[in-house]
């Protein structure tokens, strides 16, 4: 493990990650989508007393956090929230027509979907959905429909349910009476904040081979081995939606950051 934490190894991973991001940007630009549906996890934007397993943001626009270019402060999370620097935000376009169609289409297909019409004062969607803007061409005004999938227990869908969801999501998108070109993206995952390379390898194998049966059997206990690992379900959902097209792996980088094995199984891939 010490070798994984060496400066040279970290720099090597950094170079690999930048190269993977460049390839993703090329793929997104080539796809030339008119609207993007992003499957990810809502962080801190559902009311504390109301949490949904599945949800769709259907507002005309929503606030998204953006980098403030301030030096990284590792102690910020331990301070009183009132004394922390406020993240910068910018408004991004949604697509209510597609969002409403997805809600009704999924309900028709057996999925009860919550809808979110906007954010409370001071709230903003974070990098879970904001990452897509790093991939879209600079200056793009492509609208985004956030599809929110809970990663939290006990209101967390099973892997099998997410496979069924992905299939229904595809049908709903295909039934939309529009000439607009719809893109679909999974954001988040794979294993983190403790890396599980065995699980990640199984997931990547399922994504690249199109083995939805195996992805549907991913153990709930293993998926919850670390707080962020359930975000794998985002990928399972999109893989099912994209079937029979399999994912092409761009890169998998286990980015370790401590001797305890903490870190992030960073994964990049494309469908199409």
Please provide the spans of the model-predicted regions.
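Flexible, D/E/H-enriched segments
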Residues: 1-33, 51-167, 175, 195-272
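Short, solvent-exposed loop/turn segments at secondary-structure junctions
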Residues: 43-45, 152, 191-192
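A contiguous pocket-lining binding segment that forms or flanks enzyme active sites
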Residues: 168-174, 182-196
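Beta-strand elements within well-structured catalytic alpha/beta cores of enzymes
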Residues: 34-41, 147, 180-188
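Short, glycine/charge-rich beta-strand/loop segments that flank catalytic centers
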Residues: 38-46, 118-123
């Amino acid at each position: 493990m010490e070798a994984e934490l060496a400066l040279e190894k970290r720099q090597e991973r950094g170079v690999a990650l930048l190269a993977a991001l460049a390839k993703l940007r090329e793929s997104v630009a080539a796809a030339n989508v008119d609207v993007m549906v992003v499957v990810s996890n809502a962080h801190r934007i559902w009311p504390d007393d109301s949490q949904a397993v599945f949800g769709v943001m259907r507002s005309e626009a929503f606030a998204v956090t953006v980098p403030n270019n301030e030096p990284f402060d590792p102690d910020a999370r331990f301070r009183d929230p009132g004394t922390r620097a406020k993240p910068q935000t910018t408004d991004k376009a949604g697509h209510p027509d597609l969002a409403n169609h997805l809600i009704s289409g999924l309900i028709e297909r057996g999925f009860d979907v919550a809808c979110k019409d906007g954010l409370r004062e001071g709230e903003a969607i974070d990098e879970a959905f904001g990452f897509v803007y790093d991939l879209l061409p600079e200056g793009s005004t492509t609208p985004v429909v956030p599809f929110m999938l809970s990663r939290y227990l006990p209101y967390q869908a099973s892997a099998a349910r997410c496979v069924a969801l992905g299939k229904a999501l595809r049908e709903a998108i295909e039934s939309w009476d529009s000439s607009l070109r719809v893109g679909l993206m999974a954001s988040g995952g794979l294993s983190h904040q403790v890396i599980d390379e065995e699980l990640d390898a199984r997931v990547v194998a399922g994504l690249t081979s199109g083995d939805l049966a195996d992805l549907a059997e991913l153990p709930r206990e293993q998926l919850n081995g670390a707080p962020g690992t359930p975000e794998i379900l985002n990928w399972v959902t999109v893989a099912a939606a994209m079937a029979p097209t399999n994912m092409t792996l761009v890169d998998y980088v286990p980015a370790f950051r401590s001797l305890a094995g903490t870190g992030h199984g960073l994964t990049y891939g494309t469908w199409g």
